[in-house]
Curated annotation (Swiss-Prot):
Domain of life: Bacteria
The protein's enzyme class: oxidoreductase
Region (Disordered): 260-288
InterPro entries: Haem_Oase-like_multi-hlx, PqqC, PqqC-like, PQQD, PqqD_bac, PqqD_sf, Thiaminase-2/PQQC
Gene3D superfamilies: Coenzyme PQQ synthesis protein D (PqqD) (1.10.10.1150), Heme oxygenase-like (1.20.910.10)
Name the record gives this protein: Bifunctional coenzyme PQQ synthesis protein C/D
Annotated stretches, region: PqqD: 281-372
Length: 372
């Protein structure tokens, strides 16, 4: 006989699971697939992203946040029972608020503003990645078109969100000096809202998934939702981390920022050059002792394999020459001493080096990331 038997179907797909087994199967999906495991989130929480990379995350995540009440409204319209509608509509209130200036979307806008965006730019959604839009829209369509059981089961990622929220808040407050508790106020409410919503949805799925096929559909729905979240981070990583290929219609660093940072000097391509500003640079002399102001630090970005200069409101990419100079800026060396050290290191004339680095130092001082 040459025909092959089909592979055996796992036992959990053939029989009706108990409520406890179904819950365990659902939670196992989160343990393996929830987006807290994505490399982008590990970088975000561990403080290894630049400010512009954090901005890209905040901007794209806004579209997801903004469409959550749209998704919930579509589901609400399909609920046949008034009691269920009363319970589910609280989700819409949580995000839209009871009045202007209230709700989760408003708090996410404050987060985006906190990292430098103008409100109008974020609201326009014109800078979000196409993959973000496709993923989020697919989720809205899924909830609108699939069975109520599948639609509700897809929301069960909220079972896992308290863990990622705790990691995110602690990690970002620790590792980014431009992030404050006020910036992350969105997550305060979600620590209580998400478990409440998850408890209701989990109970609904347990009671209404009454056949093996329906249980399988619920499991697949949660898997789909995890894929929606994961895909958004895949797109962010590809565009803004590695290989760093930003699509032509997506946000470019420097766009949509408040007036203080909406200039050429804030783009990642801006080097430590006085040409980046039209104002007259602050002159340095050989006897001056340059130093980094409080809150400004030189850091090696492991993700991009290059040094950056981090300031409270901006991030500068640095070329090798700027890095060599700034490594010697310790608040003790004069400009002439720095030039002498570099001359010995590179077997070059210190006078020529000093003449080269003076305008660079002046440009950095003009950008308020260097002082004397």
């Amino acid at each position: 006989m040459t025909a092959q038997f089909p592979p055996p179907v796992p036992d959990t797909e053939q029989r009706l699971l108990s409520h406890e087994e179904l819950e365990a199967a659902l939670r196992d999906i989160g343990a393996r697939r929830y987006h807290n495991l994505h490399p982008f989130h590990r970088l975000l929480h561990d403080g290894k992203l630049s400010k512009d990379q954090v901005r890209a995350w905040a901007l794209n995540r806004y579209y997801y946040q903004a469409m959550i009440p749209v998704k919930d409204a579509a589901l609400l319209a399909r609920l046949p029972d008034a009691q269920l509608r009363r319970i589910w509509r609280q989700r819409i209130v949580d995000h839209d608020g009871d009045h202007e200036g209230d709700g989760g979307i408003e708090r996410w806008l404050k987060l985006a503003e906190g990292v430098g965006f103008t409100r109008d730019y974020v609201l326009s959604t014109k800078g979000i990645l196409s993959a973000t839009r496709f993923s989020v829209d697919a989720y809205v369509h899924f909830v609108s078109e699939r069975s109520l059981l599948e639609a509700i089961a897809s929301s069960l990622t909220e079972m896992f969100s308290p863990t990622i929220i705790s990691e995110r808040v602690a990690g970002m407050l620790k590792n980014y000096d431009f992030i404050t508790k006020d910036t992350l106020a969105y997550f305060d409410k979600r620590l209580t809202q998400a478990p409440r919503d998850a408890d209701f949805a989990l109970d609904y799925v347990k009671r209404h998934a009454t056949t093996p096929e329906m249980q399988r559909a619920a499991i697949d729905a949660l898997t789909f939702k995890c894929n929606v979240l994961w895909t958004q981070l895949d797109a962010l990583y590809f565009a803004y981390v590695a290989p760093g290929m930003v699509p032509p219609d997506a946000w470019q660093p420097g766009e949509g920022l408040v007036a203080e940072t909406n200039s050429a000097e804030d783009s990642p391509a801006a080097a430590a050059s006085p040409a980046a500003t039209t104002a007259e640079p602050t002159a340095f002399s050989g006897s001056d002792v340059p130093r980094l102001p409080r809150g400004v630090r030189l850091r090696f970005d492991e993700v991009r394999n290059k040094h950056v200069l981090l300031a409270p409101e901006r991030t500068f990419d640095l070329d090798d020459n700027a890095v060599a100079v700034l490594k010697l800026v310790d608040g003790r060396n004069t400009v002439s001493q720095i030039a002498q050290i570099l001359g010995q290191t590179y077997d070059a004339d210190p006078a020529i080096i000093e003449a080269d680095i003076l305008p660079m130092l002046a440009g950095l001082a003009q950008k308020r990331v260097l002082e004397r």
